UniProtKB/Swiss-Prot annotation:
It holds the Pfam family DUF4200. Residues 167-198, 233-260, 396-435, 504-580 form a coiled coil. GO terms for molecular function: dynein complex binding. This is Cilia- and flagella-associated protein 100. It is found in: Cytoplasm, Cytoskeleton, Cilium axoneme. It comes from Mus musculus.
Length: 613
C-alpha cells in the first residue's frame, strides 16, 4: 500500500510540474507498470517458494498438543486465582477486556499510520527536491528522441492522463471519506472512553457509598444487638421475679385451701344445735346490716348527695376488713391445734369416712351454715364451736365408737348377704338344670309328634293309592312285587349284598334314605374345592361320553347314508311314464276325545309322586 501511494503521488507530481510533457508521463506510467509487474512476480515467487513455517495455519510436527492444552489450563487457573485476589473495582468483565484490547490495537494502528505518514512526507520532499534540480531535467530532455506524434498517440496519451487523473480523484475522495470515517470513529471512541471513565468514577463513588452504608449498618446492628441483649437480660430477670411471685402466691393459696378445709372440717364436727343458732345469728346480723345500710343510704342521699358515696364505700371497706383480720388470727390458732390433733390420731380420719353422722353434718353445714365467701363479703366475725383441742379429741372418740359399732353391723350384714347369695346361686343352678331338662323333653316330644304325623300322612296316602277302586287284587300284588324287586336292586347297589337279611320294602327304603342322609352330611363336610374338582371330573366324563355317543351316531348315520347311496347306485333306473300324479284334498279328520288316556296319565303322576318323592 505504501509503494502504491508513493508511485501515485510521484506520477501526479510529475504531471502537475511538466504541464503536459508526454515523455515524462509515459516514462512514469511505464515505470509504474514495470514496478507493479515486478512486485506481482515477486509475490508469485514467494508464494511458490514460501516455507511451511510462514503459513499461519500450519503447526510444526515437534509441537505437543497435550502440552499446549495443559499450558492453557494452567494459565486459565492462574488467571482465576489472580482475579480472586483482586478487589471489586479492579476486576474486569469480558466486555471491558474486549474494549481494552480494541483500544490498544487502535493506538498501535494510529502509531503505525503516523510513522508511515512521516515516511511518505519525507519521500515526497526528496522527490520534490530531485525534480527541482535542473541538471536532472536537462539530462532527461537531452537523452529523449523527438519522434513525430500522431493524433492517435495524442488521443491515447490524453485518454491515459484522464484515466490517471480520474483514478487520483477517486482515490483522493476515498482517502477523504476514510479519513472522515476515522475521525468520526475516533470521536465516538473518545466519547465512549469519557462515558466509561464517568461510569467508572460513578461506580467507584457507588462502592464508596456502599462501604459507608455497610459500616453504618454494622454499627447500627451492633447497637441493636447490644440493646436486644440488655432487654433479654431484663426480661429474664422479670420472668424470674414473676415465677418467684407466682410460686409464693401458689404457696399462700395452698395454705389458704388447707385452712379452709380445716375450717369446714371443724364446722362439720360442730353439733347441729350450735349450727342452727349460728344460722339464726347470721340471718339477724344480715337483716340489721341491710336496715343500717338503707338508713345510711337515705341519710347520705339527703345530706351529701352523690359526693358521700366514696367515703361510705371506704368506711364500709374498712369496717369489713378489720373483723376479717381478727377472724384470720383466731382461726389460725385453732387450725394449728387441729393439725396437731389430727397428726396424733391418723386412724380417726379414716373412720370418719364411714360414719353417717359426718355426712349428715356436711349436708346440714352446706344447707344451713353459710360459706366462707359469704361471711367474708358480709364482714361478720364467725365464731367456732371448738375452743380447745380436747373438745375435738372427745368428738373423735365418740365418732370412733360409733364407727366401730357400724363396722360390726356391716360385717354381720355382709355375712348374711354372702349366705343369701350362695343359696340364690344354688337355687338358680338347680332351676336352670330343670329348665334344660324340660326343654329337651319338649323337643324330643315335638320330634316324635312330627314323625308320627309324617307316618300317618304316608299311611293315608298309601291307603288312598292302593284302595283307589280301579285296581284288582292280582294287579296290586304284581305291582308290589315289581316295586319290591326295584327297591331290592337299589338296596343292593347302595348297601351291598352282605347286609341283606329278608327286609321289607319299607325297611329297605328307610335304610337307603338313612345312608343317603349320611352321604349328604359327609358331602357337606367335604371341602368345596374337592367337590368342585369331582364335579369337573364328572362333567368331563359326561362330555366325553356324549362326544363318543355323538361320534357313534354320526358314524351310524354315515354308514346308513352310504348304504342308501350304494342301494340307489345299484338299483335299476325307473323311467317315468304318463302324467304326474296330483294330490287331492283330504276329508276332515274326526277328533276323538281321549278321556281314558288322561285318566291313565293322572294315575301315572300319582304313582310317580308316591314312589319317587
Amino acid at each position: 500500500m505504501a509503494f502504491k501511494a508513493r508511485s501515485s503521488r510521484f506520477s501526479v507530481k510529475m504531471v502537475e510540474d511538466t504541464g503536459g510533457s508526454q515523455d515524462l508521463i509515459n516514462n512514469s506510467f511505464s515505470s509504474f507498470i514495470e514496478e507493479k509487474s515486478k512486485e506481482s512476480k515477486k509475490n508469485k515467487g514467494n508464494v511458490t517458494i514460501s516455507d511451511r513455517s510462514s503459513n499461519p495455519f500450519h503447526i510444526s510436527r515437534d509441537m505437543d498438543y497435550f502440552l499446549l492444552r495443559e499450558q492453557e489450563q494452567n494459565q486459565a487457573i492462574a488467571e482465576r486465582e489472580q482475579k480472586k485476589i483482586l478487589r471489586v473495582h479492579q476486576k474486569m468483565t469480558y466486555a471491558s477486556k474486549v474494549s481494552a484490547k480494541h483500544t490498544s490495537l487502535r493506538r498501535e494502528l494510529q502509531l503505525e499510520d503516523e510513522m508511515e505518514q512521516q515516511l511518505l512526507n519525507a519521500e515526497a520532499k526528496e522527490m520534490n527536491c530531485f525534480r527541482e534540480n535542473n541538471d536532472w531535467k536537462l539530462a532527461m530532455t537531452r537523452e529523449r528522441k523527438r519522434e513525430p506524434e500522431t493524433l492517435n498517440d495524442y488521443m491515447e496519451k490524453r485518454r491515459s492522463m484522464f484515466l490517471l487523473q480520474y483514478a487520483l480523484a477517486m482515490k483522493r475522495n476515498e482517502i477523504q471519506r476514510l479519513e472522515m470515517l476515522a475521525t468520526r470513529e475516533e470521536n465516538r471512541l473518545e466519547r465512549a472512553e469519557k462515558f466509561l471513565e464517568k461510569d467508572a468514577s460513578l461506580f467507584d463513588e457507588f462502592l464508596r457509598e456502599n462501604d459507608r452504608n455497610s459500616v453504618q449498618a454494622m454499627r447500627m446492628a451492633e447497637k441493636e444487638t447490644k440493646i436486644k441483649t440488655e432487654k433479654i437480660v431484663e426480661i429474664r430477670e422479670l420472668t424470674a421475679q414473676i415465677t418467684s411471685i407466682k410460686s409464693e402466691i401458689s404457696k399462700f393459696e395452698d395454705t389458704l385451701k388447707h385452712y379452709k378445709i380445716y375450717k369446714e372440717f371443724l364446722y362439720k364436727l360442730s353439733p347441729k344445735e350450735w349450727l342452727d343458732e349460728q344460722q339464726e345469728k347470721h340471718l339477724a346480723f344480715k337483716r340489721a346490716k341491710e336496715s343500717s345500710e338503707l338508713t345510711r343510704n337515705n341519710s347520705t342521699a339527703i345530706l351529701f348527695g352523690d359526693k358521700g358515696s366514696g367515703s361510705k364505700s371506704k368506711t364500709a371497706f374498712l369496717w369489713k376488713e378489720v373483723p376479717g383480720l381478727k377472724k384470720v388470727t383466731k382461726t389460725g390458732r385453732l387450725v394449728k391445734a387441729l393439725s396437731s390433733s389430727i397428726q396424733s390420731l391418723p386412724q380417726v380420719g379414716q373412720l370418719t369416712q364411714l360414719s353417717p353422722h359426718s355426712e349428715l353434718d356436711s349436708r346440714l353445714s352446706s344447707t344451713m351454715f353459710p360459706s366462707q365467701d359469704d361471711t367474708d363479703s358480709d364482714g361478720e366475725e364467725l365464731a367456732l364451736y371448738f375452743t380447745e383441742p380436747q373438745q375435738l379429741l372427745d368428738v373423735f372418740t365418740k365418732l370412733e365408737e360409733e364407727n366401730l359399732s357400724l363396722i360390726q353391723n356391716t360385717q354381720e350384714m355382709e355375712e348374711t348377704l354372702d349366705e343369701l347369695n350362695v343359696t340364690l346361686k344354688n337355687t338358680q343352678i338347680r332351676m336352670d338344670k330343670e329348665v334344660n331338662l324340660l326343654k329337651q323333653w319338649i323337643a324330643s316330644m315335638m320330634i316324635s309328634i312330627s314323625k308320627e304325623e309324617e307316618s300317618a300322612a304316608e299311611l293315608e296316602l298309601k291307603a288312598r293309592v292302593f284302595h283307589f277302586g280301579e285296581y284288582q287284587g292280582d294287579q296290586q300284588d304284581t305291582m308290589l312285587e315289581s316295586l319290591n324287586h326295584k327297591v331290592l336292586e337299589v338296596y343292593r347297589k347302595c348297601v351291598g349284598m352282605q347286609q341283606e337279611a329278608n327286609l321289607g320294602t319299607v325297611q329297605m327304603l328307610t335304610v337307603v334314605e338313612r345312608q343317603l342322609d349320611e352321604l349328604l352330611e359327609n358331602l357337606e363336610r367335604v371341602p368345596q374345592v374337592k367337590i368342585e374338582q369331582a364335579e369337573k371330573a364328572k362333567e368331563r366324563e359326561r362330555r366325553m361320553r356324549l362326544r363318543e355317543e355323538k361320534a357313534m351316531m354320526q358314524k351310524q348315520l354315515q354308514e346308513e347314508r352310504l348304504q342308501r347311496a350304494r342301494a340307489r347306485a345299484q338299483a335299476k333306473i325307473k323311467k317315468k311314464r304318463g302324467r304326474k300324479l296330483i294330490s287331492r284334498s283330504h276329508p276332515p279328520v274326526i277328533k276323538v276325545k281321549e278321556v281314558r288316556e288322561q285318566t291313565l296319565i293322572n294315575k301315572d303322576k300319582e304313582e310317580m309322586l308316591f314312589f319317587f318323592t
